[in-house]
């Protein structure tokens, strides 16, 4: 249940209720020792109507003020610096996104996040909102796009001025047999790999790519061996790291 004070969750373990407020979330993130602490916000569905999106943004802005009050009145617990990143919201409405970006830019945080995208809206609308927001957010602070995305999404985000990303896709899709490669997507459950004893990816970015064959990895998935999940996750994470390293090289060279 969500209200002005915060959000009440019911434990899936014992049914107990727990209230998360902006203040409590800041305290938890201090205790965790997060290098980057994220503001407490509402991530409204991408299909939200305008009035709900506007109401949600107002709540997120009020919660942000409470987050900064708590953050500024507490100290790191473990002797190293922690940063608080506010989160731009506003669904797919340009005026709300502009309002949110301007409000957050005024906070002069050490970095800023863009949230509430890749949550059901069309991909082109996501790119449009990134452009709207990054016209406003300062260029000398990291701009972090939350929960995105596919390799193409990441390159398109970089093109539009995004500096940081996070996403479950490399590991979640990997656990389901999907490998991202330099030559496209491979579904390792497919029968086509059954007798393919070539390396997973001969020019891949990870040591697992030449250590195991495609046929063996397919066998592991069909045998429901946990090793399959590990190999696929390692491969996909290495691919994503290779992708952004290549993007960085081309940015520095001026030919991205």
List each language-model region with its residue ranges.
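Glycine- and acidic
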Residues: 46-50, 54, 111-117, 226-229
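Alpha-helical packing segments of well-folded alpha/beta enzyme cores
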Residues: 25, 56, 60-63, 67, ...
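Glycine-rich phosphate/ribose-binding loops and adjacent secondary-structure elements
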Residues: 58-61, 70, 74, 83-200
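Electropositive phosphate-/nucleotide-binding environments in soluble metabolic enzymes
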Residues: 19, 23, 54-61, 94, ...
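Residue-level signal for inorganic ion chemistry
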Residues: 29, 104, 254
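Structural signal for hydrophobic packing residues in well-ordered secondary-structure cores
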Residues: 33, 64, 68-71, 75, ...
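Non-catalytic, usually N-terminal nucleic-acid engagement modules in DNA/RNA processing proteins
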Residues: 1-77, 186, 190-194, 222
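C-terminal extensions of enzymes
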Residues: 41-47, 201-256
């Amino acid at each position: 249940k969500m209200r002005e004070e915060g959000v009440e969750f019911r434990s899936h373990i014992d049914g107990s209720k727990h209230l998360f407020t902006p203040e409590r979330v800041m305290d938890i993130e201090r205790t965790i020792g997060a290098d980057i602490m994220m503001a407490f916000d509402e991530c409204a569905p991408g299909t939200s109507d305008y009035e709900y999106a506007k109401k949600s943004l107002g709540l997120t802005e009020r919660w942000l003020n409470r987050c900064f009050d708590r953050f500024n009145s507490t100290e790191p617990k473990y002797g190293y610096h922690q940063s608080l990143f506010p989160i731009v919201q506003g669904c797919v409405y340009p005026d709300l996104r502009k309002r949110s970006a301007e409000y957050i830019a005024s906070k002069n945080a050490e970095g800023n996040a863009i949230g509430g995208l890749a949550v059901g809206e069309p991909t082109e609308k996501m790119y449009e909102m990134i452009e709207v927001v990054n016209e406003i957010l300062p260029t000398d602070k990291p701009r972090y796009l939350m929960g995105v995305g596919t390799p193409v999404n990441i390159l398109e985000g970089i093109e539009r001025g995004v500096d940081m990303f996070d996403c479950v896709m490399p590991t979640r899709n990997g656990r389901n047999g999907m490998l991202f490669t330099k030559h496209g997507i491979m579904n390792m459950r497919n029968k086509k790999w059954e007798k393919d004893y070539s390396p997973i990816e001969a020019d891949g970015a990870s040591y697992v790519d030449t250590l195991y064959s495609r046929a063996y990895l397919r066998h592991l998935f069909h045998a429901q061996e946990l090793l399959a999940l590990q190999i696929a996750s390692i491969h996909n994470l290495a691919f994503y790291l290779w992708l952004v390293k290549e993007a960085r090289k081309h940015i520095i060279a001026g030919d991205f």
